[in-house]
Amino acid sequence: PGPNGCPRRRGRQTYTRFQTLELEKEFHYNHYLTRRRRIEIAHALCLTERQIKIWFQNRRMKLKKELRAVKEIN
């Protein structure tokens, strides 16, 4: 817990270039992961399942924003 009794927030995760490349590669093939695949990727990249899950959630939101921006241009 922090100084005022509130739980401390985790620091921002930074991914290596290799991890990012592998995650992007996986996202290119599949925007959603099965639990089994998430476990495999987590082990391969030395990350937690939770980090993989959140990375994919964030990446889907990024894609959604990008698609919305392209739609507005056209």
Curated annotation (Swiss-Prot):
Localization per Swiss-Prot or TrEMBL: Nucleus
Molecular function GO terms recorded: DNA-binding transcription factor activity, RNA polymerase II-specific; RNA polymerase II cis-regulatory region sequence-specific DNA binding
UniProt keywords, alphabetically: Developmental protein, DNA-binding, Homeobox, Nucleus
Extent of the signal sequence: none
SMART domains, per database record: HOX
Gene Ontology CC: nucleus
InterPro entries referenced in this protein's UniProt entry, alphabetically: Antp_homeobox (IPR050296), HD (IPR001356), HD_metazoa (IPR020479), Homeobox_CS (IPR017970), Homeodomain-like_sf (IPR009057)
DNA-binding region: 8-67
One GO process term, biological-process aspect: anterior/posterior pattern specification
Task performed by this protein: Sequence-specific transcription factor which is part of a developmental regulatory system that provides cells with specific positional identities on the anterior-posterior axis.
Family: Belongs to the Antp homeobox family.
PANTHER family in UniProt: HOMEOBOX PROTEIN ABDOMINAL-A, HOMEOBOX PROTEIN HOX
Listed name of the protein: Homeobox protein abdominal-A homolog
Organism this protein belongs to: Apis mellifera (Honeybee)
Gene: ABD-A
